[in-house]
Amino acid sequence: MKSLIKMSQAVAAASLLFISATAVAVPITTLYSAGVDDSGAPLSLGANEQHYEIVAGSPSIFTPVVTSHSAYMPSDASSSWISLPSGFSSATYQTTFDLTGFDVSSASLDLKIAVDNTITDVLINGVSTGFSIVFGYPAFQSWSNLTVSNNFLAGVNTLQFLAVNSGGPGAFRVEASGNATAVSEPSLGVLFGLGLMWLAMTRKRKA
């Protein structure tokens, strides 16, 4: 009996090690930067934005287009500027991403944000991050960085950027990346454990 208990404990420990070893952080592939297509390639100037929309509550009221301005830091292969509609003094840029199959406690987003003119907050699933970008040339000539590491949901998550334009052209840009640990398949750990137990019992009989 004691040997069986020890064997079970050893199998359980080995199974946990197996599951831990297979828990690796991977990119969140449903999170996109502004101004790119589904493959991550930059959209052409004037093209409709594919992953961010401007909302006033729900539903969406405007699809931004890829834009450019000589005063802005240039768009590149990773992201592009998207426009604020003429006459809008404020707008909420919104995107969603899916954490189905991931451990939400392990998720983390790295966001590089620029805006013309200001960001008053960034919300993850309606919860404030306390992040803001103040009015001034640095707002659209350099990046402001934000890391989000909590308030995630299993399934679809909503990310919102609250922007204000103080006159003239308005635009927004974000380079977004993230990673999370995929949820381990319990069946793999169980099969691994059963295999160890069978091997141990076989050796015990032979002995």
Show where each model-derived region lies.
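Short beta-strands within extracellular/lumenal beta-sheet-rich domains
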Residues: 87-101, 144
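Bacterial N-terminal signal peptides that target proteins for export
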Residues: 2-11
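Short strand-turn-strand beta-turns centered on an Asx-Gly dipeptide
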Residues: 123-129
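Accessory carbohydrate-binding/adhesion or oligomerization-edge regions at the termini
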Residues: 26-80, 96-100, 148-181
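Aromatic-lined ligand-binding clefts that engage carbohydrates, nucleic acids, or primary amines
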Residues: 103-122, 159
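Extracellular beta-rich ligand/substrate-recognition surface
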Residues: 79-92, 132-139
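A short, hydrophobic C-terminal helix/tail in secreted or cell-surface proteins
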Residues: 184-202
